[in-house]
Amino acid sequence: MAKDIKFSEEARRSMLRGVDTLANAVKVTLGPKGRNVVLEKKFGSPLITNDGVTIAKEIELEDAFENMGAKLVAEVASKTNDVAGDGTTTATVLAQAMIREGLKNVTAGANPMGLRKGIEKAVTAAIEELKTISKPIEGKSSIAQVAAISAADEEVGQLIAEAMERVGNDGVITLEESKGFTTELDVVEGMQFDRGYASPYMITDSDKMEAVLDNPYILITDKKISNIQEILPVLEQVVQQGKPLLIIAEDVEGEALATLVVNKLRGTFNVVAVKAPGFGDRRKAMLEDIAILTGGEVITEELGRDLKSATVESLGRAGKVVVTKENTTVVEGVGSTEQIEARIGQIRAQLEETTSEFDREKLQERLAKLAGGVPVIKVGAATETELKERKLRIEDALNSTRAAVEEGIVAGGGTSLMNVYTKVASIVAEGDEATGINIVLRALEEPVRQIAINAGLEGSVVVERLKGEKVGVGFNAATGEWVNMLESGIVDPAKVTRSALQNAASVAAMFLTTEAVVADKPEPNAPAMPDMGGMGMGGMGGMM
């Protein structure tokens, strides 16, 4: 396919138009008085959001060169989201400011490589200063403040703080859609996995449509059970003990399932069968987790064990098991604390080594289930559109809170970026390097300026006053007052601010050193189909 190539000034100008289009759509959402953006969806209702990365990912421009510029800035938002989980709008605003300011200087004759060095020096100094002024997060109230600022909702802040108090800082907190209008916190005690009963005839409570087993034995295997003879020896031993039985297997089907159901209905014994959770290697790991939690063994041919040789000693035990149509919850497993702790340590080690985001998520889930108790924030809203928007905000707030726990907090509302201004301005440099430092200084003002503009105020006035204020004092755009940001609970995670600045500078430096841009030439439109209107059908009468 033929290519279009643009060079130097023309190339950068084309890409800048794309940068501005995307950044202008994203930056209207910044701050407590930021607006929303409506995104069209091919199916279902449109999505209304103020989440920077969600907006950035949706934007696709017709002009190939402009689109490349837009995609570069979308990359800033996406990378910041991956690392810190929030701060995507701030990152976009910083990137746009650095690119615009840098481009003016390149046009005026500055050397892009010199500018790049200056930008890198300035950002390194700013990040060092951010580390110095950040404060460790302490107590439930600080966590609630960080979450409330990110979600723009105090109630959500309290829910997240409560959830984190229960599971610790690196515990798993899941989000689910509620069937009601309210958002609430629900804690699932014990280990829960998403597999329900193999047959509805196994339920013990017909009102709640669930099976409840008290002090059951638990048979754990990765085999498919289709012949009752395979498990008959262990079944007889369990019946003699007079205890219910939970069977976790790859599948229970055919004659085996029919026999279990018939005996359950006759009252011969109380048994519930469920499929094993997960797939492949993850299934094996989860079965091993359940075995360790309940003090049982996984009966698998890999270890030379078969079902016929299983005894009650190889079965797990738990205080209670609740099985619904969709979930199984094992409460009060009797596994040894030492073995559970060792397993948790093993999963933590895997977490540190993994590079896959999906694997990390699954390992964290396993960790939380073993530790016992998974908080679920059930998000409620009046409409589906509002529900999607709330869910995105709460997701951001969760990520933001975790980031705050990792690297501490700094003054929010763009104030911390202005607090490092003096440190960056004091760097000694000459020529284009000094110009690069000035580009970063100009960009550091931009988030505060944009927050003030979104609140209907004159941005430059707020920026100039902030330069003369003490560290930590800033402008509360929600009330229009000048306050101590940390004391007022207007805080940002240091990790979010750091990531936004680093990623914005990285893309801006790449942009300014671009000298040629190559894109596919648009394909000519296919010729229209000829008009068929004149073709009569009279000559086809003989075919009737």
Curated annotation (Swiss-Prot):
Ligand binding (ATP): T29, L30, G31, P32, D86, G87, T88, T89, T90, G413, N476, A477, A478, D492
CDD domains (UniProt xref): GroEL
Gene Ontology molecular-function annotations: ATP binding; ATP-dependent protein folding chaperone; isomerase activity; unfolded protein binding
Reactions that this protein is recorded to catalyse: ATP + H2O + a folded polypeptide = ADP + phosphate + an unfolded polypeptide
A Pfam cross-reference name: Cpn60_TCP1
UniProt GO BP: chaperone cofactor-dependent protein refolding; protein refolding; response to heat
Predominant subcellular localization, coarse grouping: cytoplasm
Top-rank EC class of the record's enzyme: isomerase
Record field: transmembrane: none
Cell location: Cytoplasm
Purpose: Together with its co-chaperonin GroES, plays an essential role in assisting protein folding. The GroEL-GroES system forms a nano-cage that allows encapsulation of the non-native substrate proteins and provides a physical environment optimized to promote and accelerate protein folding.
Family indicated by similarity: Belongs to the chaperonin (HSP60) family.
HAMAP family per the UniProt record, alphabetical: CH60
Protein name, as recorded: Chaperonin GroEL
Record organism: Bacillus cereus (strain ATCC 14579 / DSM 31 / CCUG 7414 / JCM 2152 / NBRC 15305 / NCIMB 9373 / NCTC 2599 / NRRL B-3711)
